[in-house]
Amino acid sequence: MSCCGGNCGCGSGCKCGNGCGGCKMYPDLGFSGESTTTETFVFGVAPAMKNQYEASGEGVAENDRCKCGSDCKCDPCTCK
């Protein structure tokens, strides 16, 4: 498995998208021995959720079933 390990995102046409920056993609998520605490509050109103039968006829994103494999190539690519 490459060091992208889940940081790859498949873009349009089942090509690997802009989500793969390599091992140092998220430097602040590394372990440096320091500990910090961050609190985030999100306030807002979300639209009502549709049940699965109402939402099933709507468009599906082109990269819905793609995921990036070990070498940042899409694996498997089953986009419809």
Curated annotation (Swiss-Prot):
GO molecular function: metal ion binding
Keyword Phosphoprotein: no
This protein's UniProt keywords: Metal-binding, Metal-thiolate cluster
Source organism per UniProt: Brassica rapa subsp. pekinensis
Pfam families the record matches: Metallothio_2
Protein name, entry field: Metallothionein-like protein BIF98
Metal-binding listed as a keyword: yes
Function noted in UniProt: Metallothioneins have a high content of cysteine residues that bind various heavy metals.
Alphabetical list of InterPro entries matching this protein: Metalthion_15p
Membership in a protein family: Belongs to the metallothionein superfamily. Type 15 family.
